[in-house]
Each structure stands twice: as structure tokens, then as C-alpha cells.
């Protein structure tokens, strides 16, 4: 990985606007790394608003990144695995693109805020983290990508005021993140396939009290050995009382009391290669309550 690198660069951008409806921003960046040489990064952003209630956005471009294998993954050292780092890690390189739609839709005398977005990343070079791969069991290897690696992400979220003081927010995200390990294209470990969120927030007419409840659904995914962990649901709640110069709040987290049964593998043998505290895919503590105060400082 990179221990020292100097990268001067030049950047140029052009902005074209057609009234208030269309904005186009192409750009290009040239950099020269004393480790990887010269590289060019093009970008394009487009924003189009055909009507007041809708805004379309699109982007495409290329990205480069210098890997810092151990510095960026210190938590992965919390195991007894044998760690190896390839001496010739390449600069990471990827194409990315995406699009989004934002709408403010009149509905029953109120405004529904609806957003949809999709992003795609295709890696040409990537530093992958290979667990228990060709180097054997209980190993961790930082290697260059040899095959495909990509990420598809789709998200939709909506906010709507049901009635005076009551706001509902819902969101759902799908992830398709795959990478090639030892010649096999598989789901990236410890990456949930989906996530859902529902929040109810209510303020009393004088805004002295606020009540918030949030439910979160976390999707299933793969572990290092290709076994799967299950989806699980969590619930959070908070009550806030506003005063003139401060606010008092009380709440609870993980009210469903969901916990992983065995978060640390082989915890009774911490000095063996089988010890592993890096596969924590969910909460390790049960339901928790808290209380706090926020004080509002006067403007100077």
C-alpha cells in the first residue's frame, strides 16, 4: 500500500445553463502521482427541471484512488488470521454513473416529497480483501482484483405530512454488490442486500412536545465462509420536551432487543488463528434507554 505519495493536479470545468430548466457541467481533471504516473478523470453532471414539481439529475465519470490497505482496515486486525498484503497493489480505478428523480407531488392538499435514485460503479482495478481464500483457512489477504467487481444501488424515499404536526418518512434501498474472489464472482461479505426505514414524527400544536418512532429493517447477507446471516428488525423511539433555552429528551434504542448470539468467533481461544471479532453483522447489545439535555446558546 501507499506509504507516501505526492499528486499535483489540474482541474477544468464548464457550466452551461439554459434558463432555470437545464444545467450541464462537464469537467476533467489531470493528476500526476509520483507512484502511479499520470491519469485523467472526466466527469459530467446534468440537472433538468421540466416542471416545478420534478427535477432530474444524472452523473457519470471516472475515479482513481490510492490504496492504504492496513490503515483503512484496522478493525480487520481484530482476529487471529494470518495477514498478507500484496507488494504491488495497483491504484484503484472505476467508472461510476447514476441518476435521480426528485418530485414534489400535490396530494390531498399537501405535498408528497418523493425521491428515487440509482447508482452503478464498475471497478477496473480494486484492492480486494480475501478471507480464507487460496492462501488457506484463517487467512486475510489484500490483493488486486482479478475479475469483475461492481455495485448497483437503488433507493426510494418519501416524506408526507399526514396531518398537522405528523410527518411520515419511508425509505427502501436495494444493494447488489459483487466481487471476484479466487475466480468466483460472489456477494461482497457483510453487505446487506436491502434496508428499509419507516419514521413517524409528531409535534404538538405549540411544538412543546415531539414524539419520534423509527423502525429499521436490515437485510440478510453473506459471511466470509459464504454462510448467510438473517434479516432483522430494530425499533427506536424518542420523546422531546422543548423549553425556552433547552430541551430534554428521553428515548430507547434497539427496543426489539435483537442481538447476535455469538458475535466473536472462538472467543474462548483468543490466541488461535480461529479467533475472529471481525464478523459482527448486527447489534451486540440489547435494548438501551437514554436521557439527555440540549442547551441553546444565545447568539454572540
In which residue ranges do the predicted regions lie?
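Surface-exposed extracellular loop regions of Gram-negative outer-membrane beta-barrel proteins
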Residues: 2-33, 39-43, 160, 164-173
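Transmembrane beta-strands of outer-membrane beta-barrel proteins
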Residues: 24-26, 56-58, 97, 112-116, ...
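Membrane-embedded beta-barrel scaffold of Gram-negative outer-membrane proteins
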Residues: 49-51, 55-57, 90-144, 150
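C-terminal beta-signal and adjacent terminal beta-strands/loops
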Residues: 168, 239-300
Amino acid at each position: 500500500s501507499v506509504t507516501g505519495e505526492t499528486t499535483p493536479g489540474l482541474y477544468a470545468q464548464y457550466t452551461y445553463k439554459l434558463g432555470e430548466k437545464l444545467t450541464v457541467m462537464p469537467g476533467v481533471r489531470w493528476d500526476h502521482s509520483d507512484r502511479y504516473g499520470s491519469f485523467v478523470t472526466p466527469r459530467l453532471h446534468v440537472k433538468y427541471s421540466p416542471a416545478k414539481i420534478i427535477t432530474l439529475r444524472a452523473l457519470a465519470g471516472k475515479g482513481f484512488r490510492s490504496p492504504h490497505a492496513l490503515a483503512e482496515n484496522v478493525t480487520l486486525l481484530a482476529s487471529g488470521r494470518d495477514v498478507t498484503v500484496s507488494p504491488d497493489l495497483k491504484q484503484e480505478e472505476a467508472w461510476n454513473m447514476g441518476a435521480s428523480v426528485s418530485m414534489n407531488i400535490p396530494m390531498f392538499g399537501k405535498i408528497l416529497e418523493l425521491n428515487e435514485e440509482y447508482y452503478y460503479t464498475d471497478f477496473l482495478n480494486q484492492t480486494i480483501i480475501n478471507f480464507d481464500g487460496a492462501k488457506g483457512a484463517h487467512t486475510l489477504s489484500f490483493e488486486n482484483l482479478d475479475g469483475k467487481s461492481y455495485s448497483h444501488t437503488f433507493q426510494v424515499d418519501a416524506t408526507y405530512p399526514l396531518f398537522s404536526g405528523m410527518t411520515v418518512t419511508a425509505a427502501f434501498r436495494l444493494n447488489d454488490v459483487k466481487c471476484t474472489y479466487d475466480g468466483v464472482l460472489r456477494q461482497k461479505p457483510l453487505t446487506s442486500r436491502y434496508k428499509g426505514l419507516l419514521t413517524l414524527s409528531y409535534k404538538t400544536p405549540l411544538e412543546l412536545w415531539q414524539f419520534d418512532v423509527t423502525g429499521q429493517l436490515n437485510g440478510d447477507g453473506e459471511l466470509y465462509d459464504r454462510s448467510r446471516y438473517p434479516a432483522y428488525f430494530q425499533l427506536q423511539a424518542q420523546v422531546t420536551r422543548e423549553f425556552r433555552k433547552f430541551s430534554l429528551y428521553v428515548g430507547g434504542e434497539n427496543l426489539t432487543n435483537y442481538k447476535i448470539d455469538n458475535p466473536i468467533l472462538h472467543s474462548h481461544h483468543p490466541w488461535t488463528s480461529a479467533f475472529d471479532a471481525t464478523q459482527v453483522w448486527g447489534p451486540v447489545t440489547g435494548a438501551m434507554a437514554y436521557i439527555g439535555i440540549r442547551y441553546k446558546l444565545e447568539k454572540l
